[in-house]
């Protein structure tokens, strides 16, 4: 009888990455390392060739917003489409085409600050699973550090309405081993 592995095997996902610049390249590298089945789409023949040789992934040269290109990349079998080209509009259109023509999740990188107030509307109306603005996310993380400089970790819940702060406490502070009710009594 063979011993069962303590680690649960994660199902390999079929992922299409549109745009193989720095972010697309890094995503490809990480997701291949995790054992996922990756297809990249880029307009540059050189980028497609270099990336497919480096990571042993499938590559398609073309415009990721084209339904024909997405179908050639395996859209019908894809679990996830990630669009990280240099164009916000292309990323959104790519995800819209994928969402409307297949049953897969979609992630679009959108960097233009003009869209920040419209992200929820865009996500809900277009059916995009996730929209990521890396610059906005970075700015928010920096603000958290500035707001709570002594926190060693800050977790955010409820769409940013709740923050859980992790602090390192010293024995002389008198907080160690106390319940929240006991601490609340000390603060009144």
Segments from the language model and where they lie:
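Cytosolic regulatory regions of ion transport systems
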Residues: 1-188
């Amino acid at each position: 009888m063979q011993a069962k592995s303590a680690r649960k095997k994660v199902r390999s996902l079929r992922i299409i990455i549109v745009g193989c610049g720095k972010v697309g390249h890094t995503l490809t590298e990480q997701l291949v390392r995790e054992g996922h089945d990756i297809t990249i789409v880029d307009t540059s023949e050189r980028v497609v060739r270099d990336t497919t040789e480096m990571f042993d992934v499938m590559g398609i040269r073309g415009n990721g917003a084209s339904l024909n290109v997405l179908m050639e990349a395996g859209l019908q079998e894809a679990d996830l489409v990630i669009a990280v080209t240099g164009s916000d509009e292309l990323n959104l259109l790519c995800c819209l085409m994928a969402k409307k023509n297949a049953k897969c999740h979609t992630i679009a990188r959108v960097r233009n600050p003009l869209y920040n107030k419209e992200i929820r509307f865009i996500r809900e109306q277009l059916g995009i699973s996730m929209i990521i603005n890396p610059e906005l996310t970075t700015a928010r993380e920096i603000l958290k550090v500035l707001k709570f400089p002594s926190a060693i970790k800050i977790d955010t819940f409820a769409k940013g309405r709740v923050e859980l702060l992790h602090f390192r406490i010293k024995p002389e502070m008198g907080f160690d081993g106390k319940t929240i009710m006991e601490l609340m009594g000390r603060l009144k």
